[in-house]
């Protein structure tokens, strides 16, 4: 049996009772270690808590060496641990498909993730649209396909959750080209860098999906003891120091509910200004009034 087990957001004890029982019954335990990190627990602490050795599964192992993970899973129990919920990344869906192709039974044990815990910032979950990912820009690569999704969300008044890039056990282009197994230090995108990249792409595309004054909410270390939120404009949060990772961001939709706004005011330095920014943004992105079609005369 292959178990895909969600670990939750932060603590070693965030795993569910059913998930913990499954881990204890597994021969091998893998921890996916490149789409997210467990902020309040180390590998060693997890091993002590589970009473099991934990094998770190980097991108290369999961995407290219899945046969190693699935080895003998038709005869013994193998656990694949994922920070958050198991289906927070398409890679994990692919692992399930490979297991099923090999006739290996699969059981998924869910947990909290940023996709639902984001509601703790005060925005209502059913007012969210498509989620986007913001990657680190390079000199030669500045992807902007996410921009269209932000535009679509904003047109129908929905908030956009932005997941920020992390780089764990990544190689530089030079080391890859030379075949050197030398890895760069871990990097975690900050709220400020995300906002700077948002502004850069809006300037480039100039389609007015948002402006520098569009309200956003910065989320830091969600689910951890030092969880914090910051509400302001994209321009303001482009200079905001949110502290230690992990970070994420929400771009407000143009139809923010009054209860959402009241909640967000607790996270801003200037309540009156933020209120006015929200009102101005809603007017800025207000669609043209609907005009009924002219009926043709007989």
UniProtKB/Swiss-Prot annotation:
One of its GO terms (biological process) is protein histidyl modification to diphthamide. PANTHER family: DIPHTHINE METHYL ESTER SYNTHASE (PTHR10882:SF0), DIPHTHINE SYNTHASE (PTHR10882). Belongs to the diphthine synthase family. Its main location: cytoplasm. Its EC number is 2.1.1.314. One of its GO terms (cellular component) is cytoplasm. It is found in: Cytoplasm. CDD domains: DHP5_DphB. It is an enzyme of class 2 (transferase). It catalyses: 2-[(3S)-amino-3-carboxypropyl]-L-histidyl-[translation elongation factor 2] + 4 S-adenosyl-L-methionine = diphthine methyl ester-[translation elongation factor 2] + 4 S-adenosyl-L-homocysteine + 3 H(+). Keywords: Cytoplasm, Methyltransferase, S-adenosyl-L-methionine, Transferase. S-adenosyl-L-methionine binds at residues 9, 85, 88, 113-114, 164, 222, 247. It comes from Candida glabrata (strain ATCC 2001 / BCRC 20586 / JCM 3761 / NBRC 0622 / NRRL Y-65 / CBS 138) (Yeast). NCBIfam families: dph5. Pfam families: TP_methylase. HAMAP family: Diphthine_synth (MF_01084). This is Diphthine methyl ester synthase. The keyword Ubl conjugation does not apply.
